[in-house]
Amino acid sequence: MAGGIELAKKAIRSLKNYDEHENRYGSIFSVSGPVVVAANMLGCSMYELVRVGHEELVGEVIRIHQDKCTIQVYEETSGLTVGDPVQRTGKPLSVELGPGLAETIYDGIQRPLKQIFDKSQSIYIPRGINTESLNREHKWDFTPNKDLRIGDHVSGGDVFGSVFENSLFNDHKIMLPPRARGTVTYIAEAGSYHVDEKLLEVEFNGKKHSFSMLHTWPVRAARPVADNLTANQPLLTGQRVLDALYPCVQGGTTAIPGAFGCGKTVISQSLSKYSNSDLIVYVGCGERGNEMAEVLMDFPELTIDINGKPEPIMKRTTLVANTSNMPVAAREASIYTGITLAEYYRDQGKNVSMMADSTSRWAEALREISGRLAEMPADSGYPAYLGAKLASFYERAGRARCLGSPDREGTVSIVGAVSPPGGDFSDPVTSATLGIVQVFWGLDKKLAQRKHFPSINTSLSYSKYINALQPWYEERVPGFNTLRDQIKQIIQQEDSMLEIIQLVGKSALSETDKVTLDIAGIIKNDFLQQNGYSDYDRCCPLYKTYHMMRNMIAYYTKAKSAVETGSVPWSKIKESTSDIFYELTSMKFENPNEGEKEIVEHYETLHKKIEDKFHTLTE
């Protein structure tokens, strides 16, 4: 009798297992480009990861209706047929977070491109390929947290050890996942471990949980923080026009809209190369593959000095490449993949910059998928929720106090390039972006055609962070804010004068206006313009920017006051100070590699020369 009951229980268990196995599979009902409808999918959840077809293509559930669900597939769907199996995974689209992220190039759903190439020996990504995001073969030197003991209580975000990843990222903190907690029952000793080996075991409610160096996190969910803080440190870019006139903060949001050929990618790349961020996440979203190839070729050659030793900046960079010839649906995921990686770095207590090039291509991917779903189109065919999607992405930027102990602060700055068709800033993507971001670096097609780079339009661009940054500038660079206001004023005055000159000619201007016009010419041609491909000017440190501004404004102030007294006309001043005028135009040629002290001395000498010359002129 007892044996019969046991057999019955065993049969019920096997039937349950069979049902569960059967419930994990649906079948394809229809295929429309990257959008697949699957039937018999009862129990699946929104944004669940699924495997589509016999090749197990990666897809994500984006709509559920009765037992049917709509899936966006992140790979080429040609060859799928009605009736092919659809396997549920029971988890959302997630990324792996841990040592090995830096120096790696991923596709839009965090598949490492180098490993895929080594595995397939093809320049194209094979369909359905499944590789681990983090290298399971490599061993990392783990150092446990010396303050952690068995029996201690830990919660999400607590650092239980660290790993030396590379010379630019030498303190990769190993943290408890944000939602984990418990009492420590085991912690590994110092040594070399693979990313998936058990390093920590905690007990909570009688259940034991093991943790390794890596953990996963769903890309569409923002990582939690202990507190959001006000950003008050500048994101220094090395571009004079941006640092001086339209600064951004670490933890800020910036848009760079501009037509084709205006230099959006060059600005994004120079930010990645020279900004004062600790780590960079560069997302190439729907742009040309050559641009990502350029990044891969340039970055290993570019170096920054760490303790007197040059290190390639690739060591602080993670690339997410989703070029225009890759499947459209993966563009949408690539932005979320990039921001999740950036948030993980922020939780390390780092200042992170994320470049999204370009959010317009991401919006176009949304439009295509929205059209396939037969949703009601809004302006220019974009979905009605475009603004909400953009806002939810940009809102993940900011400065925050991280979860767990020890206390640490980190920032995520987002710089989004926008490519409006024909450079039209009334485009829905540009309009929606401008309502969200705090800094607007507008690029001008006419300036780009005149080979004036960076082609920032000074009358269109703005920054809402200037007031927040004033205390920082006053403390470290006294007088910087006043110089900025004076330079902006000169540029605005010149813009209004140009209309008068076109009507009545330059001779009709007053003497003070002639001074303003000539100094504005120096500011525009020799200060705002910058050669990104030269040693001396590709990156301009803040001290160089400040002294250039100081000397130009000193000359302007002295010349203007001399002209206003009526003692000397501007033409005579310009003639007698022609050597100083030439030196003002040549200030940009000072190479920062020569050292700060030497350059500052040169600028100070020029400043004294200006004062002495005008003193003798006005006597």
UniProtKB/Swiss-Prot annotation:
Amino acids binding ATP: 258-265
Reaction catalysis annotation: ATP + H2O + 4 H(+)(in) = ADP + phosphate + 5 H(+)(out)
Keyword Transferase appears in the UniProt entry: no
Signal sequence segment: none
Cellular compartment(s): Vacuole membrane
EC number, UniProt record: 7.1.2.2
Tree of life domain: Eukaryota
Main location: membrane
Membrane topology: Peripheral membrane protein
One Pfam family this sequence matches: ATP-synt_ab
Biological role: Catalytic subunit of the V1 complex of vacuolar(H+)-ATPase (V-ATPase), a multisubunit enzyme composed of a peripheral complex (V1) that hydrolyzes ATP and a membrane integral complex (V0) that translocates protons. V-ATPase is responsible for acidifying and maintaining the pH of intracellular compartments.
Gene name linked to the record: vma1
Recorded GO MF terms: ATP binding; ATP hydrolysis activity; proton-transporting ATPase activity, rotational mechanism
Stored InterPro entries: ATP-synt_VA_C, ATP-synth_a_Xtn, ATP_synth_asu-like_sf, ATPase_a/bsu_AS, ATPase_F1/V1/A1_a/bsu_N, ATPase_F1/V1/A1_a/bsu_N_sf, ATPase_F1/V1/A1_a/bsu_nucl-bd, ATPase_F1/V1_b/a_C
Organism of derivation: Schizosaccharomyces pombe (strain 972 / ATCC 24843) (Fission yeast)
Top-level EC class: translocase
Protein name in UniProt: V-type proton ATPase catalytic subunit A
Gene Ontology cellular component list: fungal-type vacuole membrane; vacuolar proton-transporting V-type ATPase, V1 domain
Family: Belongs to the ATPase alpha/beta chains family.
GO biological process, one term: intracellular histidine homeostasis
Subunit structure: V-ATPase is a heteromultimeric enzyme composed of a peripheral catalytic V1 complex (components A to H) attached to an integral membrane V0 proton pore complex (components: a, c, c', c'', d, e, f and VOA1).
Key words, A-Z: ATP-binding, Hydrogen ion transport, Ion transport, Membrane, Nucleotide-binding, Translocase, Transport, Vacuole
